[in-house]
């Protein structure tokens, strides 16, 4: 008799995705981040659900309701901090996952890659709206500044901003709709992640060499289930160290002050995971130009497959491209640092140079290096 997991309509799907899935025998720990992102998403949905039971999306009571969760709800503080720091872990995993994709040429799986870029945008939108909900100073002013960027769109900009606000400023209507969107988006992300996985399983996973691994596959279970469980333990360990020892390390002190439309904080900045894009936005002295650069800084990922000029898929055997990749990582870390600094000398010029370097590396230097490496192979 055939095993039920191979015949049952529902179990068959799970079996083909997580048990009998043929996986390359040589995928490294960089391939762990997909499952870690799934764990992060589940964790965020669960903690978010419990927070929503006690939160009120009203300008008069939102800040107080978050304080109430932390002070009066049983284990409310741990749920709140797991949710806030869970977002940081989510983005660490996301950046690692995307970086892996760039390094090993995984972007040649076009559908998988493009859905991944949509997932990145959706996650960024969710995180932004979630940051507005506690209704602290940085929540309010962050929402005001970022939504205001849409006014740079010619002709329809102003109307669009007022439509999103639900009035003439960020107010009760804005908070209510942001809560609604923040609640629904993670489920859309979960659905998209399923499609992401569906397309990945059409082709099978890439591997560090970038060469077809059809001749050498192993079953996903037990080899990669145990590996994913180890990764999950390390993720939970890192998250709980953050939550239990330094829960406010990555937050902004300004967000412990209730939102006040009459008092602007001296330095408006988003959470750390948006700082690189924020630095690119600020480095262009024109509003529309800055907004375009901001969007392009993420949308440029869609161009990755078109910019792939190398005869090899992975960077594993391409030292020049490897060097440029790590310069890109250093550049992104520089942008992240600049995004958190005030707009003054020397930070302005450093940010502008780092922004130019970012686009130059992806659009010009990396494709050029690939072409040079192709020619070196002929020698």
UniProtKB/Swiss-Prot annotation:
Signal peptide: none annotated. It is found in: Mitochondrion inner membrane. A ubiquinone binds at residue 201. The keyword Electron transport applies. Component of the ubiquinol-cytochrome c reductase complex (complex III or cytochrome b-c1 complex) that is part of the mitochondrial respiratory chain. The b-c1 complex mediates electron transfer from ubiquinol to cytochrome c. Contributes to the generation of a proton gradient across the mitochondrial membrane that is then used for ATP synthesis. Its main location: mitochondrion. Heme 1 (or BL or b562) is low-potential and absorbs at about 562 nm, and heme 2 (or BH or b566) is high-potential and absorbs at about 566 nm. Heme b b562 binds at residues 83, 182. This is Cytochrome b. GO terms for biological process: mitochondrial electron transport, ubiquinol to cytochrome c. It is a multi-pass membrane protein. Keywords: Electron transport, Heme, Iron, Membrane, Metal-binding, Mitochondrion, Mitochondrion inner membrane, Respiratory chain, Transmembrane, Transmembrane helix, Transport, Ubiquinone. It holds the Pfam family Cytochrome_B. The chain crosses the membrane at residues 33-53, 77-98, 113-133, 178-198, 226-246, 288-308, 320-340, 347-367. GO terms for cellular component: mitochondrial inner membrane; respiratory chain complex III. One of its GO terms (molecular function) is metal ion binding. Its cofactor is heme b. The cytochrome bc1 complex contains 11 subunits: 3 respiratory subunits (MT-CYB, CYC1 and UQCRFS1), 2 core proteins (UQCRC1 and UQCRC2) and 6 low-molecular weight proteins (UQCRH/QCR6, UQCRB/QCR7, UQCRQ/QCR8, UQCR10/QCR9, UQCR11/QCR10 and a cleavage product of UQCRFS1). This cytochrome bc1 complex then forms a dimer. Binds 2 heme b groups non-covalently. It comes from Ourebia ourebi. Heme b b566 binds at residues 97, 196. Belongs to the cytochrome b family. The gene is MT-CYB. InterPro entries: Cyt_b/b6_C (IPR005798), Cyt_b/b6_C_sf (IPR036150), Cyt_b/b6_N (IPR005797), Cytb/b6-like_sf (IPR027387), Cytochrome_b (IPR030689), Cytochrome_b_C_euk/bac (IPR048260), Cytochrome_b_N_euk/bac (IPR048259), Di-haem_cyt_TM (IPR016174). The keyword Ribosomal protein does not apply.
């Amino acid at each position: 008799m055939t095993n039920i997991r191979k015949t049952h309509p529902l179990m068959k799907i799970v079996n083909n995705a997580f048990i009998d899935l043929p996986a390359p025998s040589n995928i490294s720990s960089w391939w762990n981040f997909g499952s870690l992102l799934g764990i992060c998403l589940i964790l965020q949905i669960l903690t978010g659900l419990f927070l929503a039971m006690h939160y009120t999306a009203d300008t008069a009571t939102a800040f107080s309701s978050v304080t109430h969760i932390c002070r009066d709800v049983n284990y409310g503080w741990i749920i709140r901090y797991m949710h806030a720091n869970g977002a940081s872990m989510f983005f660490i995993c996301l950046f690692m996952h995307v970086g892996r994709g760039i390094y090993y040429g995984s972007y040649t799986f076009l559908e998988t890659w493009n859905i991944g870029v949509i997932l990145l945008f959706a996650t960024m939108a969710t995180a932004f709206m979630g940051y507005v909900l506690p209704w602290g100073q940085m929540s309010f002013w962050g929402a005001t500044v970022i939504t205001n960027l849409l006014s740079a769109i010619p002709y329809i900009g102003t109307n669009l901003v007022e439509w999103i606000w639900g009035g003439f400023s960020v107010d009760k209507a804005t908070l209510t709709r942001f809560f609604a969107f923040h609640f629904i988006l993670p489920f859309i992300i979960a659905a998209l992640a399923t499609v992401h996985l569906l397309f990945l399983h059409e082709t099978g996973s890439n591997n560090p060499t970038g060469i077809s691994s059809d001749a050498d596959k192993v079953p996903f279970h037990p080899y990669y289930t145990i590996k994913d469980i180890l990764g999950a333990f390390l993720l939970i360990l890192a998250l709980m160290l953050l939550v239990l020892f330094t829960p406010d390390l990555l937050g902004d002190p300004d967000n412990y002050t209730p939102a006040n439309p009459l008092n602007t904080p001296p330095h408006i900045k988003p959470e750390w995971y948006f700082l690189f894009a924020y630095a690119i936005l600020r480095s262009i002295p024109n509003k529309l130009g800055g907004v375009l650069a901001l969007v392009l800084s993420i949308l440029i990922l869609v161009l990755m497959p078109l910019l792939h000029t190398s005869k090899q898929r992975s960077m594993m055997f391409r030292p020049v491209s490897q060097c440029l990749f790590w310069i890109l990582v250093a550049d992104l870390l520089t942008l992240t640092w600049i995004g958190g600094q005030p707009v003054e000398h020397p930070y302005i010029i450093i940010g502008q140079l780092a922004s130019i370097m970012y686009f130059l590396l992806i659009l010009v230097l990396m494709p050029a290096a690939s072409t040079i490496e192709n020619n070196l192979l002929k020698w």
